[in-house]
Amino acid sequence: MGKFGDFSSICRMAPIPLCASVGPITSIATGVGIEPDCYARNIEVANTIIFQGAASVMHIVALVMTVVMLLHVRGKFTAVGRKEITTFFYLYMILTFLSLCIDAGVIPPHSGSYPYFVAVQAGLASALVTCLVINGFVGFQLYEDGTPLSLWMLRLCSFVAFVISFLVGLATFKSWAGLGPTNTVGIFVVLYFLNALQLLLYVVMQIILVTRTLQDRWPLGDIAFGLFFFIAGQVILYAFSSPICEGISHYLDGLFFATTCNLLAVMMVYKYWDSITKEDLEFSVGTRMNNWEVKELLPQGPEEDRRATVYADPIYEGHYASGPGTGSGASASGYEGGHHRRESHGYTPSPNRQSLRY
């Protein structure tokens, strides 16, 4: 077990992108970088080698599912926190697309631009978690949702989190400000420690919200499942990635399971938000048919009396009819209840890493 903030043991177990830009410079390697003990085998498509084929497929699935969730969220015009939760899904979509490019090898690990993209990925991860926490405050109605105050506070807090993680990550990869590939305490703190605290804060806030303001307790199940999927993905990635990879002959590794579990956790966030919000159908007639309530039948003229019908007119006179989806029970939208300053551009993967066999 290494010291606090050391990525040596982590990177040998888990094939995470930043491992290509941290670690000591040895006499054998041409640059920094820690290669995992086992990683998923590459695939070849149109004379192009693609890293992490299974994980890349899951990234594409995650993009499709995010689009579906966004369409559902945008369809609930009057739901509480609609614009705020939409920002969360947009950030997740951008992070997933960038992770797809990095994991699949579209951005080569030995290129000069690779550390910058990994730093952006770290910044987006922190911004995503911060955005989720700010969304957690919306339910307490401390301020009006959807207003410039709410939206700009969400954007500014997420942007600050992005800038902090991006700068700390870039300083670590480029040996700036006392940080470096062998001094990774800073990026460890902002990526793991602070983000874990924010996620814990979000879970506690939502439990308080459900138990104290809502009569329905089913949303607690969404929180529990989301927490389970996220923790399971992290445990598989950082504790069992190499054994799984070796056990199934390099076809999959922990990154595939972590990507899948992260998607399921995000889907539980959507399910939780959907279960504690409802919309006012009176203001959603643009996407739903027959939402009008008929107060009274129109008076019949002489020419209408000549129409042949098997129903007697007096039966319908003076009665009220209502279209589906409306009624007096509809309520307003709301909640239901080294010392060497050597510039490095990442390591050059070993010949086995470029092979299609492993």
From Swiss-Prot:
UniProt cross-references to InterPro entries, sorted A to Z: Chs7
Topology of this chain in the membrane: Multi-pass membrane protein
Cell wall biogenesis/degradation keyword on record: yes
GO molecular function, one term: unfolded protein binding
Record localization: Endoplasmic reticulum membrane
Disulfide bond entries: none
GO CC, alphabetical: endoplasmic reticulum membrane
TM helices/strands, residue ranges: 49-69, 88-108, 117-137, 159-179, 185-205, 220-240, 250-270
Span of the signal peptide: none
Region (Disordered): 321-358
Alphabetical keyword list: Cell wall biogenesis/degradation, Endoplasmic reticulum, Membrane, Protein transport, Transmembrane, Transmembrane helix, Transport
Ranges of compositional bias, category Polar residues: 347-358
Pfam families cross-referenced by the UniProt entry: Chs7
Chief subcellular location: endoplasmic reticulum
GO biological process: cell wall organization; chitin biosynthetic process; protein folding; protein transport
Family: Belongs to the CHS7 family.
Quaternary structure and partners: Interacts with chs-3.
Functional summary from the UniProt entry: Chaperone required for the export of the chitin synthase chs-3 from the endoplasmic reticulum.
Protein name (record): Chitin synthase export chaperone
Species this protein is from: Neurospora crassa (strain ATCC 24698 / 74-OR23-1A / CBS 708.71 / DSM 1257 / FGSC 987)
High-level lineage: Eukaryota, Fungi, Dikarya, Ascomycota, Pezizomycotina
